C-alpha cells in the first residue's frame, strides 16, 4: 500500500501563557517556530499538510499565506488539546489513509525524523507509528484511518497520546 494518502496535521491552536506573545512566533535559530515546523512537514508531505490554529489564528494566518498548507481554524480551542485534534481530523479528505499528528512546539523534530515515521507506516498502513517516550509513545505519531473515530471521540484535556497508550495496543516505535 505504498500509495496510501497521508496528511500531516500540525497542531498550533493553544494560546500559551497569558500576556505573552504567541509561542508559535518564537524564534528558533532566527526562524519563527510555526513556519519552521510547517517547512519541515511540507518537506516530507508536500501539499498534504494542514495546520490547526485557534487562539492566535487572526495574527498567525497572514504569515502562512505563501506556505503550501491547508489552514484549519479551531473555534473550540479553549476546550483543551482534544479540540484541535478533532478539527484537524474532521478536515481530512475521505481518501486519507492516515494522519501524522505533530505539535508545532516540537522544534527538535526534524524532517528526517518525520520521514522515518512515514517510511515505517507505508510498510503497514494499518499500524500506529510513533516516537517512544518515557510514558510509552508520544507525538509525532501516525494514526491510520481506523483510529480516526477514537481521535474524534477525544474531549477536553485528552490528547491523542491517550490512543497510543491504551493497554494491549500495538504501536510501532520509531526512535
Predicted regions and their residues:
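Conserved beta-strand scaffold positions in the cores of enzyme catalytic domains, especially
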Residues: 25, 71, 128-130, 169-173
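Conserved N-terminal catalytic core of the sugar/cofactor nucleotidyltransferase
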Residues: 34-98, 119
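Conserved beta-loop-beta/alpha segment of the NTase-like Rossmann-fold superfamily
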Residues: 77-145, 149
Amino acid at each position: 500500500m505504498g500509495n496510501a494518502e497521508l496528511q500531516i496535521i500540525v497542531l498550533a491552536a493553544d494560546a500559551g501563557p497569558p500576556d505573552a506573545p504567541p509561542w508559535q512566533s518564537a524564534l528558533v535559530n532566527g526562524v519563527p517556530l510555526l513556519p519552521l515546523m510547517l517547512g519541515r512537514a511540507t518537506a516530507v508531505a508536500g501539499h498534504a499538510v494542514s495546520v490547526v490554529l485557534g487562539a492566535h489564528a487572526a495574527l498567525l494566518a497572514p504569515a502562512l499565506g505563501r506556505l503550501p498548507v491547508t489552514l484549519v481554524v479551531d473555534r473550540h480551542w479553549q476546550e483543551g488539546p482534544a479540540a484541535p485534534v478533532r478539527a484537524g481530523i474532521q478536515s481530512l479528505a475521505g481518501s486519507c489513509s492516515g494522519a501524522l499528528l505533530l505539535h508545532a512546539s516540537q522544534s527538535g523534530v526534524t524532517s528526517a525524523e518525520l520521514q522515518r515515521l512515514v517510511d515505517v507506516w507505508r510498510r503497514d498502513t494499518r499500524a500506529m507509528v510513533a516516537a517512544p517516550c518515557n510514558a510509552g509513545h508520544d507525538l509525532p505519531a501516525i494514526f491510520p484511518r481506523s483510529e480516526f473515530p477514537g481521535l474524534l471521540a477525544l474531549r477536553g484535556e485528552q490528547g491523542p497520546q491517550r490512543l497510543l497508550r491504551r493497554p494491549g495496543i500495538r504501536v510501532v516505535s520509531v526512535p
